[in-house]
Each structure stands twice: as C-alpha cells, then as structure tokens.
C-alpha cells in the first residue's frame, strides 16, 4: 500500500470537486486514504465526532434538514459571489496555505476560547506559537498593548466562526484573517451578515466553509465539532497538527466566557458539556 501523504504533499495539492451531487453519503472515515486522494479535504480524525453531532441534534431537538439547508445556502451564496478568493479552487488553496503554516514548521497552536484572558495570550506570545480564535475570542487581541496587539494579530492563523461572535469576529474579518465559516440550522442571518462584512473589505478574508451534516458536501468540510471552540480544535487536528502541539486557552465548562457573544446562559452551559466530550474524544487537555 502507498504510504500516507506527507504534510508537504497535502499542502501542495488542491482538492478536486468531481461531478457529484451536492450531498453524498460519507465514505468510511479512513483519513489517510482519503487525504491521498483529496489532500485538502478536512475530515474528522475520529468517527465519534460525527456521531456526537447527531446526538447533539437529538438532544436539542434540531432538524438535520435545517443544518443541510443552511449549508446549501451558504455554499450557493459564496460560489455566486464575484470574489476571486472565494471560488472553490481558491478555498482549497486556502486550506493548503493553512496546512503549510500550521504543520510544515513544527509549532504550537493555541486555540483561543470564549473565556480567554490577556495574560494567557501574552504567555503564549513568548513562544513560537500560532493562534486560532474561536469566533469572538479574537477580540482579546485588541485589548493587548498596541505593539503587542499587532504582533498577536500577525500570529493569528485563522478564526473559526458561525457568525455570532460580535465585534471580535468582525475585527478579524476586517483585517482579512482567514475564516472557517460554519453553517448550522439557525445561523443563516449571522453568516450572511459576516459575508457582507467580508465582501466590503478591501481584501476579503479567505474562506473555508464547514457544516455539521453526516453527508459529504463538495466544496465544504465537516471536521467535527459543535461549539466554535471545540470545532476549532477539530479543524486544527484535521489539518494534521498533533494533539500534543495544541494548547486550549480560555476553554472552560463552568462559566460562559466574555467572548461568547449574545447567548442564553443556561443553554450555553449545557452546550459546554458537549464541548468537553468532543475535546476528550480528541484527547486534548484543557
């Protein structure tokens, strides 16, 4: 059998989008084999991550059709735009670029959660680490002293967002930070708004589109995850970053973080228990 692809091979190849329908049932999740064929597809590192998404829908009474409809609408909206960086080949190239940045040079990756504090970020900046922000947590970077803030923004590899992160998310988008934009059943207005902000900037953010259905959607990815924080960890693992190289900052299950955006506190606390299960599935400490 062929050996698994190296990070160099994965980063230099672009995903092809063959003439398939919009929705196709997932093949068995043999990550190495799939990545040899489509190196920039971001697949779950563990089948359990897709099972959890199904259980979450059942727990909260959400419909799979709503998740699929939002995903389809997002894909159509992005691909109907006239922004060159949002075409399907350029989105695949954005994945390849992020793989090069996060994997080819062995480095730590710090995922910023909704409860992240400035001192945690400052300590991480003392090391050669990259940052990945879960939605509005990117806002913590602008609370740092000016010179340090700009250095921190330069370390931000991407944000992972479903569009409801408020000012922190908007600022990252206005800076042209790459965005993993997520579709689910009740965030149509949020992702539409974020796309409008991005489209109006001089240099629109590169996009990678994600969904949470158990089907393959060409042009989109489902690396697993539920909340923005644990989905960010799923994204980083799916790109090939070892679990030992990932540090979770501001990831807590006992409080609703200040960067969570507008949310119902009771429901959010329930969601955080699912985040805990996902991170345990990934074997990532926090």
Model-derived features with residue positions:
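N-terminal amphipathic/basic-hydrophobic helices that include classical n-h-c signal peptides
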Residues: 1-35
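C-terminal catalytic "cap/lid" subdomain
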Residues: 114, 118, 166-167, 178, ...
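Glycine-rich anion-binding loop/nest that anchors nucleotide
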Residues: 110-116, 135, 221-229, 244-259
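Glycine-rich beta-alpha loop segments
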Residues: 122-127, 134
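Acidic/Gly/His-enriched mid-domain segments of enzyme catalytic cores or analogous surface patches
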Residues: 90, 103-106, 129-130, 136-241
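Buried, small/hydrophobic-residue-enriched core segments of structured protein domains
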Residues: 215, 248-250, 267
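N-terminal donor/sugar-recognition subdomains of glycan-related enzymes
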Residues: 29-109, 119-122, 256-286
């Amino acid at each position: 059998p062929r050996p698994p692809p190296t990070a160099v091979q994965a980063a230099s190849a672009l995903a092809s989008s063959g003439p398939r329908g919009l929705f196709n049932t997932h093949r068995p999740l043999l990550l190495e084999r799939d990545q040899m064929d489509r190196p920039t597809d971001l697949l779950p590192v563990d089948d359990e991550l897709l099972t959890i998404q199904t259980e979450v829908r059942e727990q909260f009474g959400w419909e799979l059709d709503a998740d699929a409809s939002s995903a389809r609408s997002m894909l159509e909206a992005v691909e109907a735009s006239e922004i060159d960086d949002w075409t399907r080949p350029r989105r695949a190239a954005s994945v390849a670029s992020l793989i090069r940045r996060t994997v080819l040079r062995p480095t730590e990756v710090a995922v910023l959660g909704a409860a992240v504090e400035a001192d945690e970020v400052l300590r991480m900046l003392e090391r050669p680490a990259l940052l990945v922000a879960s939605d509005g947590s990117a806002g913590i970077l602008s609370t740092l002293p000016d010179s340090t803030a700009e250095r921190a923004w330069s370390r931000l590899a991407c944000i992972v967002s479903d569009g409801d992160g408020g000012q922190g998310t908007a600022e990252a988008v206005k800076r042209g930070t790459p965005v993993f934009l997520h579709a689910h059943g009740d965030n149509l207005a949020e992702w539409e708004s974020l796309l409008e902000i991005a489209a109006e900037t001089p240099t629109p953010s590169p996009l990678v589109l994600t969904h949470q259905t158990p089907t393959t959607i060409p042009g989109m990815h489902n690396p697993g995850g539920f909340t923005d924080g644990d989905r960010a960890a799923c994204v980083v693992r799916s790109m090939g970053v070892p679990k030992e190289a990932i540090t979770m900052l501001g990831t807590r299950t006992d409080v609703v973080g200040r960067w969570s955006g507008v949310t119902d506190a009771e429901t959010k606390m329930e969601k955080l228990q699912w985040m805990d299960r996902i991170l345990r599935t990934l074997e990532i400490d926090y």
